[in-house]
Regions:
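Active-site nucleophile-adjacent alpha helix/oxyanion-hole segment immediately C-terminal to the catalytic cysteine
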Residues: 2-116
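Active-site signature of cysteine proteases
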Residues: 159-216
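Short coil/turn linker and secondary-structure boundary residues
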Residues: 27, 50, 121-124, 191
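Conserved active-site-adjacent core of cysteine acyl-enzyme catalytic domains
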Residues: 83-161, 167-173, 178-183
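Surface-exposed beta-strand edges and flanking loops
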Residues: 5, 23, 34-36, 148-151, ...
């Protein structure tokens, strides 16, 4: 875990290191901490209403890898979700050890957010994911989410899960819409709705989760 910055970074380290993780998961915790970077200088805050340019910049920041192929999409999406919540570039991820082996999202959640994030019921298409996100935005003004796709086929790795992000964008005088973000990618980080639907077939299973500070 690489750390730089002011005393505020020490607060994050203290919180991360104080999490009560099962001893059986110690190897997974080590992989996460070895890949996690904390950069908490007094950085400029992003605006409350994030733009596509803001999201692209934040997504590029969290991907701190040296080689593109790494099974760290769960950590990348958690880092981005954390940074979006705080409107700052704070966490990023390097390559994980055993790069073809993914990380357990429950353990990543506990380290980054302090608890496992509540997961939605199963959604069977990107259309359902979009509907769920907009519904939660309308009801509770939730605007940032982590999406887990099951049975995803990744290059080299084969069948696996894949985590990415979604944010509700509210542009002036326009209807709110969902922007998907895949910080694991090095190109097309902000795919359109049609591109993400083409990428994930309708037979996939999707789950939505989000950080709720009131949980703590």
């Amino acid at each position: 875990m690489r750390v730089s910055g002011s005393a505020s970074s020490q607060d994050i380290i203290s919180r991360i290191n104080s999490k009560n993780i099962n001893n059986n998961d110690s190897n997974e915790v080590k992989r996460i901490k070895d890949a996690l970077c904390i950069e908490s200088k007094e950085r400029i805050l992003y605006p409350q209403n994030l733009s596509r340019d803001n999201l692209k910049q934040m997504a590029r920041y969290v991907n701190n890898t040296y080689v593109h192929y790494s099974g760290n999409c769960v950590l990348l999406s958690a880092c981005l979700h954390y940074n979006i919540h705080h409107r700052q570039d704070i966490l990023s991820s390097k390559n994980t050890a055993s790069p073809t082996v993914g990380l357990d999202s429950a353990i990543v959640d506990k380290i980054i957010f302090g608890h496992e994030l509540n997961q939605s019921y199963c959604l069977n298409s990107i259309d359902e994911v979009e509907k769920e996100i907009l519904n939660r935005y309308d009801i509770k003004r939730e605007s940032s989410f982590i999406i887990s796709a099951e049975n995803y086929i990744a290059p080299i790795i084969g069948e696996c899960g894949h985590d990415f992000n979604a944010v509700v964008i509210c542009e002036y005088d326009k209807k709110p819409y969902v922007q998907f973000i895949d910080s694991w990618k090095t190109s097309n980080i902000l795919p359109s709705l049609q591109e993400i639907k083409k990428h994930f077939s309708s037979s996939r299973e999707f789950y939505v989760r989000a950080y709720d500070e009131k949980h703590d």
